[in-house]
């Protein structure tokens, strides 16, 4: 089903299901030998959502015949894990280095099943704000409480759709725009129309004191992405057990790249292509088939002032 301006979702449907997919990939990345990341909450959260395929993915419980077919395509469990492991590491490192430098406000936009407020080690006095749909926030908070998990920073949730007046809601939750902030928009931008992406950046800029930092990704050439290959891989992975069509969820219209917009509005920008990040982390290059679906993802690390 195509996106609309007022669509909504939970963690088992539409855009929300992609948050569950990401958590399943984080769980898989946490299970491989010598993992780059460790998210102990990802698998139980995915199990609680209850999508069969993602539950299997999170536990690494692949059907042998299914896995054999993927191996013929050059896709391995480690290879599937590397993409999310490297992305998660990139954002984890941004939060850790920012707070080590003295930043004490962190904002996670479209937080989904992100558990950084629980699994990272935060300096005393750090407040982590999480923004997402009310159902998503409630589900994650309640499930983690049932697991006996406690945040490792002061965690404040802002249950709001980013199409609403989230800057006002964030400030009502105690956010101080006079203090430097580290922001993340992880895996978010492709789910926004171009004009909404620009509004998001404008709001972040308005709320950011000098020294604030924003990390996100951009996908050059999204308008030419081959979604037919993505659908075929979904069938290969999950058969008929997963109804998730990425093409219907993302906005493929041409847009200004995040790095360019931010550079034009007072941010100092560093970019790193996905292939470069893999090399820096000594990971095998991305599988060519997976790589052919999307052009190279570019990570953006921007500092204001």
Curated annotation (Swiss-Prot):
Q: Which residues bind S-adenosyl-L-methionine?
A: 132, 161-162
GO molecular function annotations of the record: methyltransferase activity
Give EC number(s), comma-separated.
2.1.1.-
For this entry, list what GO says about its biological process: methylation
Return the broad EC class: transferase
Database matches in SUPFAM superfamilies: S-adenosyl-L-methionine-dependent methyltransferases
> Which UniProt keywords are given for this protein, alphabetically ordered?
Methyltransferase, S-adenosyl-L-methionine, Transferase
Q: Which domain of life is it from?
A: Bacteria
Q: Which Pfam families match?
A: LCM
The family note in this entry says: Belongs to the UPF0677 family.
Q: What exactly does this protein do?
A: Exhibits S-adenosyl-L-methionine-dependent methyltransferase activity.
Q: What is this protein called?
A: Putative S-adenosyl-L-methionine-dependent methyltransferase MAB_3787
């Amino acid at each position: 089903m195509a996106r609309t301006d007022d669509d909504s979702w939970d963690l088992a449907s539409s855009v929300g299901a992609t948050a569950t997919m990401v958590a399943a990939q984080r769980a898989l990345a946490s299970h491989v030998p010598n993992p780059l990341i460790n998210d102990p909450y990802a698998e139980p959260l995915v199990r609680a959502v209850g999508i069969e395929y993602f539950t299997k993915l999170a536990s690494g419980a692949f059907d042998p015949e299914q896995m054999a077919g993927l191996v013929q395509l050059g896709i391995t469990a480690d290879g599937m894990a590397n993409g999310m492991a490297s992305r998660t590491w990139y954002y984890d490192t941004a939060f850790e280095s920012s707070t080590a430098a003295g930043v004490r406000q962190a904002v996670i936009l479209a937080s989904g099943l992100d558990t950084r407020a629980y699994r990272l080690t935060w300096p005393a006095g750090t407040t982590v704000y999480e923004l997402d749909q009310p159902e998503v926030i409630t589900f994650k908070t309640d499930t983690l409480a049932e697991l006996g998990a406690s945040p490792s920073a002061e965690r404040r949730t802002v249950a709001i759709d980013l199409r609403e007046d989230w800057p006002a809601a964030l400030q009502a939750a105690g956010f101080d725009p006079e203090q430097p902030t580290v922001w993340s928009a992880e895996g978010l931008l492709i789910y926004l129309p171009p004009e909404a992406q620009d509004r998001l950046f404008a709001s972040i800029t308005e709320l950011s004191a000098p020294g604030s930092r924003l990390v996100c990704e951009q996908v050059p050439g999204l308008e030419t992405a081959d979604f037919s290959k993505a659908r075929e891989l979904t069938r290969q992975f999950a058969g008929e057990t997963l109804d998730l069509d990425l093409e219907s969820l993302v906005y493929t219209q041409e847009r200004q790249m995040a790095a360019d917009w931010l550079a034009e509005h007072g941010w100092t920008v560093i970019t790193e292509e996905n292939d470069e990040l893999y090399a820096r982390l000594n990971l095998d290059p991305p599988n060519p088939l997976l790589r052919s679906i999307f052009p190279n993802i570019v990570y953006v690390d921007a500092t204001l002032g």
